[in-house]
């Protein structure tokens, strides 16, 4: 709700140069000449609006809606209306790939992405209604947790690509080039 909280871990917001910005209308990973709203709405069938988020207004009085629209949420009001964390296991491997899929291809958003190295990326202010959990969007904070997904026994190829042993025998993550 417009306030920064120190967490003890690296947090990169949508305002930082290396952040992921769910406020942007353009597709982040499309070639520049194909990333504008005008070209994106033709290229991506799911894209009906330049926004990938909305106003948290369900359960608010008319006066509260005007407060939120005019100056944003105060922390007590946000705490009163938001009571869920929705954790998504994205199977995209990294936060970068997750944002690409959510923002550029599926026209969705999420508040936070937790990357493999522990970095937290915040793509929207918590005052926004991210589009990640359909009917729970208004009352929830959306968090994507980077991982490669679940695989049936015998499907070791993905694990062999992503997890290798270093010189001392310890496992390490190696992001495949694709």
What are these regions, as identified by a protein language model?
Residues 1-67:
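N-terminal pre-domains immediately preceding structured catalytic cores
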